[in-house]
Amino acid sequence: MAQHDFAPAWLNFPTPPSSTKSSLNFEKHSENFAWTENRYDVNRRRHNSSDGFDSAIGRPNGGNFGRKEKNGWRTHGRNGTENINHRGGYHGGSSRSRSSIFHSGKSQGLHENNIPDNETGRKEDKRERKQFEAEDFPSLNPEYEREPNHNKSLAAGVWEYPPNPKSRAPRMLVIKKGNTKDLQLSGFPVVGNLPSQPVKNGTGPSVYKGLVPKPAAPPTKPTQWKSQTKENKVGTSFPHESTFGVGNFNAFKSTAKNFSPSTNSVKECNRSNSSSPVDKLNQQPRLTKLTRMRTDKKSEFLKALKRDRVEEEHEDESRAGSEKDDDSFNLHNSNSTHQERDINRNFDENEIPQENGNASVISQQIIRSSTFPQTDVLSSSLEAEHRLLKEMGWQEDSENDETCAPITEDEMREFQVISEQLQKNGLRKNGILKNGLICDFKFGPWKNSTFKPTTENDDTETSSSDTSDDDDV
């Protein structure tokens, strides 16, 4: 609507110190509230309160409003939501009255029938500016200190009916960070905030001091916080719903329905400016949990790698013994099991030296894995090896003998060359080299399908170096 009407007031009010308490409570209520309040704020602003809110008299109850005005002011004053309205009432300073929000259905006709009065609006703008200066810097304006005593009892009302305890600390942070434009968009009545608290008695600190919270303030009245949270758990969207009449509440509901289609943008602003207190409170622990999980994952990964290395050493030790016992199995068992394992373990082993920055070890491991994967660990369990061999295409009794070709001398020579290379690199501690050359072809009951021609072999095997492996056997 006519948001530009607010320009002088916003410009004159650079920091909203007061938007802390009143907007805390304000936000507790439904998000439609923000939009409707903005709208009525504009409406009443336009019509300059000529509909019965007497801005020149220091009374919050305007003449024509009668009982409705009382209702609106008394009940919402407790919550600190509607008190935002009565700037004009307190100082004769402004038309910024939102008194009729809950019964806006009834008073809407009044708004529409009124005609804006520009001159009074300008005068009230000037008054507002003076008032802001006085409220922001009470020590500079002694007259102001003396004059609006009734406005200084802010703390009493808020602490008697404290805001939602969850929302208190994080909300204040958000409001301090946001600039006035954001506050205006999200439906915060920044201009009307300062005198927004209810008048309980004429005593109390200055407005400015009352609005700036002390760091340790929230837990001052723990019992009341508890009662407040209980009320909220019951599910009333307005904690002190009992204080205002059902009729007013229903009227607000009806107007909220009318405006609901267009509330989305304001809701978005509300969420961005001040996410719900639960989010704010849970954000920190959630972050720490995530970081902890990350570090745990890394440490677990490193532990697992260490464990793998230890297991490798144990298996290396057991390899020598198992090879003496299982000479007949040695070559063809190691073929399949190591092809499968080496594909997986090659990655692990290459990762560790990269972390340590040891380039020579990396190159050695790459040589080992790409040229001769069979040099790795033998499994201690024969049954597991049998199972693996069957899965990879080994057969117990050769039904297809015609496909098995004898190993040629060229293949044996190639095998010896590769094994010598690896021995130079120091990667072969024991066993397979001498056994591979000694146990000439005691195949036993198992036949290896890798003896097929290399063209078929490419289809059946998985390792990238399979062809050279076949030659090696």
From Swiss-Prot:
GO terms for cellular component: nucleus
Chain intervals with Acidic residues compositional bias: 456-473
Keyword Transcription regulation annotated: yes
Protein's name according to its UniProt entry: Vasculin
Family membership: Belongs to the vasculin family.
One Pfam family from the record: Vasculin
Sequence positions bearing Omega-N-methylarginine: R87
Protein's UniProt keywords contain Ribonucleoprotein: no
Oligomer status and interactors: Interacts with GTF2B, GTF2F2, RNA polymerase II and TBP.
Composition-biased stretches (Low complexity): 93-107
Post-translational modification Phosphoserine, affected residues: S49, S274, S276, S322, S381
InterPro entries per UniProt: Vasculin_fam (IPR028128)
Main location: nucleus
Keyword field: Activator, DNA-binding, Methylation, Nucleus, Phosphoprotein, Transcription, Transcription regulation
GO molecular function: DNA binding; RNA binding
